[in-house]
């Protein structure tokens, strides 16, 4: 089914309706040809006349092996799909009055997620009257983002969505996140002058 849909994207040979076409590619003089002459050229080479730009004036065609062309096109699409990295979003939930132990535990998990290349969506859930502490929740999320500044960049600042206040973070590039500050080298004097004791001076 997929090959059929790909085939329908291009007109070939007698399916081409234009009276003249511009041929491009190798082993042929690139110029405008009457359709009958273009078809004859393709037939002589035992190849296909493929319309690759139907909206051009006149339409642009290539003389190629159509089956091979479709195979290369499918292969290229498959390679592009493989290059697309799927990004996971990990959620971390806080309460408006999260204690330090719980906070540090979740902060450690967030660092791990970001180092693995995942995005982090952290939120404070307000239950019942705890919505009165929404400012406290915002402070908590901003602290969370600040503590992760070496690992993440902020995609979305804290925003209230119903009973949730959410912040979204995405990982920084690994070289930025893992870069360690340069350790200063111990100072080594270029030349150390030995001092003689005062009593050893020659008179």
Swiss-Prot record:
Assembly notes: Monomer.
Give the NCBIfam families listed for this entry.
infC
Q: Name one GO cellular component term.
A: cytosol
A GO biological-process term: ribosome disassembly
Q: Where is the composition biased (Basic and acidic residues)?
A: 193-203
Q: What is its main location?
A: cytoplasm
Gene name, per UniProt, is infC
Protein name as annotated: Translation initiation factor IF-3
Name the source organism.
Bacteroides fragilis (strain ATCC 25285 / DSM 2151 / CCUG 4856 / JCM 11019 / LMG 10263 / NCTC 9343 / Onslow / VPI 2553 / EN-2)
């Amino acid at each position: 089914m997929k090959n059929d849909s790909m085939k329908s994207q291009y007109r070939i040979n007698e399916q081409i309706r234009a009276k003249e076409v511009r041929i491009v590619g190798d082993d042929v003089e690139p110029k405008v040809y009457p359709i009958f002459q273009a078809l004859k050229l393709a037939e002589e080479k035992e190849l296909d006349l493929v319309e690759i730009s139907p909206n051009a004036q006149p339409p642009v065609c290539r003389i190629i092996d159509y089956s091979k062309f479709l195979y290369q096109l499918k292969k290229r699409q498959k390679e592009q799909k493989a290059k697309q990295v799927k990004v996971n979003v990990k959620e971390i939930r806080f309460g408006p009055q999260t204690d330090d132990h719980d906070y540090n535990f979740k902060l450690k998990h967030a660092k791990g997620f970001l180092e693995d290349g995942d995005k982090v969506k952290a939120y404070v859930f307000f239950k019942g009257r705890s919505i009165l502490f929404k400012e406290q929740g915002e402070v908590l999320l901003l602290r969370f983002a600040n503590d992760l500044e070496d690992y993440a960049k902020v995609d979305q600042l804290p925003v209230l969505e119903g009973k949730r206040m959410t912040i979204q973070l995405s990982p920084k590039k690994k070289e930025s996140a893992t870069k360690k500050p340069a350790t200063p080298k111990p100072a080594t004097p270029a030349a150390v002058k030995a001092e003689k004791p005062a009593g050893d001076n020659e008179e």
